[in-house]
Amino acid sequence: MDAAHLSDLDIDALEISEFLDESRLEDSEVVAKVMSASCTTCECCCSCSS
């Protein structure tokens, strides 16, 4: 029982980490788009991102 429970937790942990990685990628894409859009009006935003 314990071994099966541990393997279930491992699978859950892997799925969670994959989900976090995916959401992190999506967030960085959104941030990049916002940064590039705000660069036309805000020079300091560009210097912060680089």
From Swiss-Prot:
Residues modified to 4-hydroxyglutamate: E43
Gene Ontology biological-process annotations: defense response to Gram-negative bacterium; defense response to Gram-positive bacterium; negative regulation of translational elongation
Gene Ontology terms for molecular function: large ribosomal subunit rRNA binding
Modified residues (2,3-didehydroalanine (Ser)): S49
Cross-link (2-(cystein-S-ylcarbonyl)-3-methyl-4-(glutam-5-yloxy)methylindole (Glu-Cys)): E43-C45
Crosslink feature (Thiazole-4-carboxylic acid (Glu-Cys)) location: E43-C44
Position(s), cross-link 3-hydroxypyridine-2,5-dicarboxylic acid (Ser-Cys) (with S-47): S38-C46
Crosslink position(s): Thiazole-4-carboxylic acid (Thr-Cys): T41-C42
Keywords: Amidation, Antibiotic, Antimicrobial, Hydroxylation, Thioether bond
Sites of the 3-hydroxypyridine-2,5-dicarboxylic acid (Ser-Ser) (with C-46) crosslink: S38-S47
Tree of life domain: Bacteria
Per UniProt, location of the Thiazole-4-carboxylic acid (Ser-Cys) cross-link in this chain: S38-C39, S47-C48
UniProt crosslink position (Thiazole-4-carboxylic acid (Cys-Cys)): C45-C46
The record's account of how the chain is modified after translation: The amidation of Ser-49 is produced by the oxidative cleavage of Ser-50 rather than of a glycine, as in eukaryotes.
Positions where Serine amide occurs in the chain: S49
Task of the protein: Inhibits bacterial protein biosynthesis by binding to ribosomes. Specifically, binds to the complex of 23S rRNA and ribosomal protein L11 (RPLK) in the 50S ribosomal subunit. While allowing a weak binding of elongation factor G (EF-G) to the ribosome and subsequent GTP-hydrolysis, probably impairs conformational changes in both the ribosome and EF-G which are necessary for translocation.
Other information: The mature peptide is identical to multhiomycin from S.antibioticus strain 8446CC1 (PMID 681244). Used as an antibiotic growth promotant in poultry and pig farming in parts of Asia.
Family classification: Belongs to the thiocillin family.
Name of the protein described by the UniProt record: Nosiheptide precursor
Species name: Streptomyces actuosus
